[in-house]
Structures are given as structure tokens and as C-alpha cells.
Design a protein with these regions (language model features):
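Conserved class I S-adenosyl-L-methionine
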Residues: 1-22, 35-39, 54-57, 114-144, 185, ...
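Class I SAM-dependent methyltransferase SAM/SAH-binding core
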Residues: 27-28, 32-73
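A short acidic, Gly/Pro-enriched loop at the edge of an enzyme's catalytic core
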Residues: 72-84
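A short SAM/SAH-binding and catalytic strip from SAM-dependent methyltransferases
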Residues: 83-96
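A short glycine-rich, Lys/Arg-flanked "PGG" loop and its adjoining helix->strand segment in the class I
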Residues: 97-112
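Short alpha-helix
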Residues: 158-181
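Core SAM-dependent methyltransferase catalytic element
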Residues: 174, 194-215
Length: 215
């Protein structure tokens, strides 16, 4: 993998945020191709994915894809999951309150909710927003500051991009509590693939941030 150090930094955050999932019922919302899940024991992870093509890859990697579609339109068993997480998928949700509300209903009492994503206010977030507005990464303002392998332009353009505070407010309004925050990719984007970064507490500096809350 050409951007392996960046991926390993994100994987460390993913593993830190999820913690020990052995014996737990876990749901990945917007599981994509299951790339992150393929790096851990994902035998107990269920998934929801809008794309049939991506979901098929995730299934081959061991994720039990239970539904194809958006979380907002999915009927889930209530009080059923020990943990529900969104790894990168909240940036494609227009209505966070609606999406997070579906997750809350499906969580067991005191169940764990995790959202990992690029914050709108981060350096990566600003870069993606500019690329979205310009319709290209070849904008003069981005010359000399881009990472070697940026996020695919079509995904930047499809993203809604929310701030961390916006997500926190939506979760608090739904009654989630006992928050924890972790972050990585503290370097500027063009340097993030030079080394694997450690996970540190907080959310105000990282280019990839994990929000952990409980029902």
C-alpha cells in the first residue's frame, strides 16, 4: 500500500476506539469494502453498506453485511448491539440526528457508539472542501501542499463534511453521555505518510478523530 504509514495511523485510531470487541455484537454503519475490518478479527462484525459492490468486497473480507442501504432507511433490531461504529461514513450523512438516532435505538443500554472521521475544521477537511468547490485537486492554492495520494476526488465531492462539535451536539441532543475523544494525523497533510503517528487524546488537532459515547 503506497500510503501505508497514513493508513497505519488511521488503523491505530480505529483499534483504540473500538477496543476489545471479542464476544460482542458489533455493527459497522457504512462498512465500505471492509478494509479496516480485514486488519482485525471481524468475525463478529455486522455491516450496513449503501454500495452493493463495496459490500460484496466487505463480505469477502469477513464482514457479515446484513443490509444494503442508508442507515436512516434501515430497520434494525432495538437494544441489540453492544457497539455501533461509523468509520468515515458520517461525512456522507446529511442529517446526523436522524442517523445517530437510528443507531441509538439499536444499541443496548449503555451501549458504545463510535464515530471516526475527518473533521470539517481540520487541515484535511479544509483541503477536501476546497477540492470539492474547485472540482479538482489541481487548484493553484493546493500546489505544493497536497499529500502524495489524496482522497479520491469523487468522494470529496460527495461528502457533506461535519465538524466535530456538530457531531458532539447531535449526540448530546439524543441523550448520549460519557464521551471520550482520540485523534491522529496531527501532521499537515503533505507529511502524514512519512511516519506512523501515535493516537493521542482529544479532538482539536487531528486530521482523523474518534468520538466515543454511550447510550
Amino acid at each position: 500500500m503506497e500510503n501505508d504509514n497514513l493508513f497505519q495511523s488511521e488503523l491505530r485510531l480505529f483499534q483504540t476506539a473500538l477496543g476489545d470487541i471479542a464476544g460482542k455484537r458489533v455493527l459497522s454503519v457504512g462498512c465500505g469494502s471492509g478494509l479496516f475490518e480485514s486488519m482485525i478479527d471481524c468475525s463478529g462484525i455486522e455491516g450496513i453498506e449503501p454500495s452493493h459492490d463495496m459490500g460484496a468486497i466487505a463480505q469477502k473480507r469477513g464482514v457479515n453485511v446484513i443490509a444494503f442501504g442508508a442507515i436512516e432507511d434501515t430497520e434494525l433490531e432495538e437494544n441489540a448491539y453492544d457497539m455501533i461504529y461509523l468509520n468515515g461514513s458520517s461525512s456522507y450523512m446529511e442529517d446526523l440526528t436522524r442517523a445517530f438516532g437510528v443507531c441509538k435505538k439499536a444499541l443496548k443500554p449503555n451501549g458504545k457508539f463510535v464515530s471516526l472521521d475527518v473533521p470539517k475544521e481540520s487541515a484535511f477537511g479544509f483541503m477536501y472542501l476546497l477540492a470539492k468547490e474547485a472540482g479538482t485537486f489541481d487548484h493553484p492554492s493546493l500546489n505544493g501542499v497536497m499529500p502524495q495520494l489524496p482522497y479520491p476526488l469523487e468522494l470529496c465531492c460527495a461528502g457533506v463534511w461535519h465538524s466535530t462539535e456538530e457531531k458532539i451536539d447531535a449526540l448530546k441532543a439524543l441523550g448520549f453521555h460519557d464521551f471520550d475523544f482520540y485523534q491522529t494525523l496531527l501532521r499537515n497533510p503533505m507529511y502524514t505518510n512519512e511516519v506512523v503517528e501515535d493516537v493521542v487524546p482529544g479532538y482539536q488537532s487531528g486530521g482523523y478523530v474518534a468520538i466515543i459515547a454511550h447510550k
